[in-house]
């Protein structure tokens, strides 16, 4: 069979005219038609073969692509690949990469911490041992069905890395989690202090109360010399906070301050007559209760310090000399002696003691008469016997009068004056006496006294 060159109709080889269109078919044309038909048949056969080969080729290409993808994923996502990324970062001091790898949802590690970690690992573990221990641990966990975490440790047994299984990646590879254990640096300042420093890539402020343990946050293993500003009521200091995981205790590590600061130790001279409870020191613009064993500060070594003191003797306040310590003379522990005018203090104390002895004698006479009058008044139930000893309408006057009305007996036997303190027309005294059942009783009273000490009256019982 061949095709008509005019209409394409199939005609027999021995036909001289196309039955469809009437086209005359010569031998030459029939040969051409035959050749064309043969060519068409060959093309059809080729197309059939191509249609069979193309799907196979595509399948082979996809298979090769899958194999390549698998190896790529394995190179970057298998447990061994994950371990290799970490150890290479540590080995090459790539603090930025280490910070990224060790950061977690709850703890962001910054470049500074990461570099401290790298230095610590290389010094306390050794990079070769660190790499070997990680690879051995990963292989062991990879072959095990256990989900129990393993730890990489220093030579002294401190944990520096936790390795644990954390599900799978792409449903094929075990996912390993690499985290650095954290501890809390603890600081205990002598005074309330505010610390400002950077951690986890941002500024942090911690306020620590005096003599109380205060955590600075969470840090990964390292030996830290952390730049930090320290602010107290005495001034602002620039320095460092130092803490070393080699000296840690369980979950905490102690912090040592490293600041250019001075503590002041103050001693008094010529102050033996002053009342201990009244003694105070003034440092710059702040006043403190004084104790000979107390250490004052810290103060910055960059500024002069002005120091003075006060104390009371027999109710009068005396001041010491004022000293200014220049910044150049400030040491870590600076000793200062403040001198009082002992002659002036002693003279005043001697004068007041004479007055007090005179007043004490008068009070002894007053309370002896008061005790006798009170006992007689209660025996006779007559308040008028003792009313002159009280200031009229004072609290003790009203109270004692009520005792008579209620027939409540009050007894005072053998009164003795233990102490006296006078302030103008007001006298406060402590009296010891025996009550009605023989017990010694101490009572404090306040009295009013006139200018020439000739008359005094009870105002209240303290």
UniProtKB/Swiss-Prot annotation:
One of its GO terms (molecular function) is zinc ion binding. It is found in: Cell membrane. GO terms for biological process: response to antibiotic. A zinc finger (C4-type) spans 4-21. Residues 1-52 are cytoplasmic. One of its GO terms (cellular component) is plasma membrane. It is a single-pass membrane protein. It comes from the Bacteria. The chain crosses the membrane at residues 53-73. Disulfide bonds: none annotated. Residues 74-462 are extracellular. Its main location: membrane. The keyword Transmembrane applies. InterPro entries: Mem_prot_TcaA, TcaA_2nd, TcaA_4th, Zinc_ribbon_dom. Keywords: Antibiotic resistance, Cell membrane, Membrane, Metal-binding, Transmembrane, Transmembrane helix, Zinc, Zinc-finger. Plays a major role in decreasing resistance to glycopeptide antibiotics. Belongs to the TcaA family. This is Membrane-associated protein TcaA. It comes from Staphylococcus epidermidis (strain ATCC 35984 / DSM 28319 / BCRC 17069 / CCUG 31568 / BM 3577 / RP62A). The gene is tcaA.
